[in-house]
């Protein structure tokens, strides 16, 4: 399939350790989004930090297999980011992490060499777990490419307030809120300068305030095996649809594509697959 959009992720390269099964999977919000974008037929790249442990070679092999460019990523001494996970009734439960490994120790800073690379893309994606300092996210936003930021459910309020006016798309996980609470939250974000605010709510679908209009997207039915990566797949499909330079901007089509792809992701174990014995 020919590429229809170009997406660059900036942030986290991670391995998810399913210790009960002694299996690890590649993961991290930014890796997931980049891989999903590629699988959807787009060109994608990632700027992250590889450690010096065996997980680094594993992650590089996965990115190569998934046709994700990582030529502008960094390398550092220390462990790759990891988290330990168990599955309870099809839902992922994180039981530990190493504080981002080398990503936490050496967060991405945008350099002059990165700028031409980043501006060659149609959209950029990062998140609170990508560990970039707010000033670096603002620098990313200043490059003129639409930037999506996943605040998840636990980003510090100060960071939310600081970055809302900067980013083009603000994503939040809001499954713990009622429908009414989600709408109030979205409008509150807009009052603080949020341009386009999207809240995912698990099996209840998603709510989005995009281009000044409120949308409701129902979740697609799925035989849920593992919800790991559902939010990232939603983001990847939404962004590569709405920012596709070859198509007219269609919010409803982007939300539908996102819901369909997120449901598909939930039918597989591990965010992007590629299981391997824990290194």
Where are these predicted regions, by residue range?
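Glycosyltransferases and closely related glycan-assembly transferases
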Residues: 119-120, 134-147
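Positively charged, low-complexity intrinsically disordered leader regions
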Residues: 1-21
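Gly/Ala-rich phosphate-binding loop of Rossmann-like dinucleotide-binding domains
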Residues: 38-39, 141, 243
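Conserved phosphate-binding/catalytic region of the ribokinase-like
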Residues: 2-3, 183-279
